[in-house]
Amino acid sequence: MPGWSCLVTGAGGFLGQRIIQLLVQEKDLEEIRVLDKVFKPETREQFFNLGTSIKVTVLEGDILDTQYLRRACQGISVVIHTAAIIDVTGVIPRQTILDVNLKGTQNLLEACIQASVPAFIFSSSVDVAGPNSYKDIVLNGHEDEHRESTWSDPYPYSKKMAEKAVLAANGSMLKNGGTLQTCALRPMCIYGERSQFLSNTIIKALKNKFILRGGGKFSTANPVYVGNVAWAHILAARGLRNPKKSPNIQGEFYYISDDTPHQSYDDLNYTLSKEWGFCLNSRWYLPVPILYWLAFLLETVSFLLSPIYRYIPPFNRHLVTLTASTFTFSYKKAQRDLGYEPLVSWEEAKQKTSEWIGTLVEQHRETLDTKSQ
């Protein structure tokens, strides 16, 4: 394949950084453009110390700035779009999430058409498929089953509509007369080193005598390691650039999981952290149906107060459903079309993540020592 270039949005994020680490190992890649609204100084330094001859261009800009996006896409061969706001708690205003996740994706697609970028890979989410009810049971689901989230909550709704826009754009004519090829990847819940969600869980537990706060004990999920999700993006980029593979990939979506055992979210957190003395909360939990209707009441209160006060419920029906459902998916289609096999085994993923949790524990101890002096 001739020399090529790649733009990665959300490159400063949890998944984006891992994609960059794998991209620098790709043959014939001449330039990587890393785009985010703001990069932490340590992330910038990491990009400049990748030890590669590939040109790395750091771009800070707003995904809602259409002119900026068009300039960022000039001369690019592949766009990997991971930039998104992930929030299932209701903390971030709805319009902000819709602007970034949906409008931002639409802006980027238009920039690709105007700049004649031939390949677009969208980091979607399993949330676009549901679960719609905690009563539903989906084990090893697959792409041939028609599953679509019916939630109006901003995160699943915005990701669903953004994915629809991406797949609908497949086959669009580019400004130079070429054709845009798109695909979407739907990873399961992602874990691994530097996961903000996992970090928050551990930090809360450190302040709670190493007791992990529960909430997902009734779930059955198949979480996926961040390194394997990043690998799937690399394979999708290769596939869309390969004339023999591309016809089977363009316009398609793929569930991305790995060989992490099916388990509850609580069990996953415990398995990854038990080496450092963490334990599960043994308290009694309300039955899921009661939690669900309590969430409905809290959402009603929030709605009634909205004209005069922004009340954010501690949990909502969507969150209860996510953490109480049996919802797992197979990666066989990605295996068939992309040649995807997990790059990192469950044992290795568990070890790497556990070691990282150990660094969080050490940082916490150092903070306590400093305060006690």
Swiss-Prot record:
The active site is at Y155. It catalyses: a 3beta-hydroxy-Delta(5)-steroid + NAD(+) = a 3-oxo-Delta(5)-steroid + NADH + H(+); a 3-oxo-Delta(5)-steroid = a 3-oxo-Delta(4)-steroid. Pathway: Lipid metabolism; steroid biosynthesis. Keywords: Endoplasmic reticulum, Isomerase, Membrane, Mitochondrion, Multifunctional enzyme, NAD, Oxidoreductase, Steroidogenesis, Transmembrane, Transmembrane helix. It comes from the Eukaryota. Its EC number is 1.1.1.145, 5.3.3.1. InterPro entries: 3Beta_OHSteriod_DH/Estase (IPR002225), Lipid_A_modif_metabolic_enz (IPR050177), NAD(P)-bd_dom_sf (IPR036291). It is a single-pass membrane protein. It is found in: Endoplasmic reticulum membrane; Mitochondrion membrane. Its main location: endoplasmic reticulum. The keyword NAD applies. The keyword Ribosomal protein does not apply. GO terms for molecular function: 3-beta-hydroxy-Delta5-steroid dehydrogenase (NAD+) activity; steroid Delta-isomerase activity. Signal peptide: none annotated. This is 3 beta-hydroxysteroid dehydrogenase/Delta 5-->4-isomerase type 3. GO terms for biological process: steroid biosynthetic process. 3-beta-HSD is a bifunctional enzyme, that catalyzes the oxidative conversion of Delta(5)-ene-3-beta-hydroxy steroid, and the oxidative conversion of ketosteroids. The 3-beta-HSD enzymatic system plays a crucial role in the biosynthesis of all classes of hormonal steroids. Belongs to the 3-beta-HSD family. One of its GO terms (cellular component) is mitochondrial inner membrane. SUPFAM superfamilies: NAD(P)-binding Rossmann-fold domains (SSF51735).
